[in-house]
Amino acid sequence: MKNLLIIGARGFGREIYNLALESIGYGTEFTIKGFLDDKKEALDGYDGYPSIISSVENYAVQSDDVFICALGDVIYKKQYVDILQAKKAHFINLIHRSATIGKNTNMGIGCIICRNVNISCDVTIANFVTFQPFVTIGHDAIIGSCCHLNTYSFMGGFSQLENMVTLHTGAILLPHVKVEEGAVVGASSVAVRKVKSGTTVYGNPATLLKY
């Protein structure tokens, strides 16, 4: 039996703790050891959660440890994943029992698949991708590493996300649309053409959001 440590004990970390209790392998392949977070008081006022054991930086990886990263910001996710991988940490996938995954879909490590996610056939998913509840992924889609897909976002067939892309709640990618590295598609936005690297688009049709 492996011991799961959750990176991040804030709001999303608490959600992932609850997800882990309902995920494939809980109680047979892994149990939950606790959280890693540099904010020691992050769980103050919240009952029933395991303790914050250490910060990521100060934690010494044990042979029976496994990890999942519960950070919604893709930049911080990559930062802390890199720290632990340098310590030879082993990451697992958390897949809720209600999720559906189609034939010939390939997935890397450290992925989070929440309740009622629907991933179609022949999809390619890299490492450390988060799918929040009710995300739908069309056939032959490609998703790069450290992406975060928020609730009810949708990717059409043959669409593509490069690394570290964020789709906010209800974002839609039409079939064959590509979102380049580090870009953001805003909530309820519809991407009908390529989204350039490092940009944020918003609206229907999605256009460049200037600050």
Could you tell me what each predicted segment is?
Residues K40-T100:
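Phosphate-bearing ligand-interacting subdomains
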Residues G25-D44:
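NAD(P)-binding Rossmann-fold cofactor-contacting core
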Residues N3-L4, T31-K33, D64-I68:
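Short active-site oxyanion
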Residues I6-I7, L36, A70, N150:
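Short hydrophobic segments within beta-strands
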Residues Y17-L19, Q79-I83, I125, K196-S197:
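Short amphipathic alpha-helical segments
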Residues N93-L209:
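Structural signal for interior beta-strand "rungs" in well-ordered beta-sheet cores
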Residues K2-A20:
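Glycine-rich adenosine-cofactor-binding loop
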Residues G11-R14, I75-Y76, N106, V190:
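Short alpha-helical
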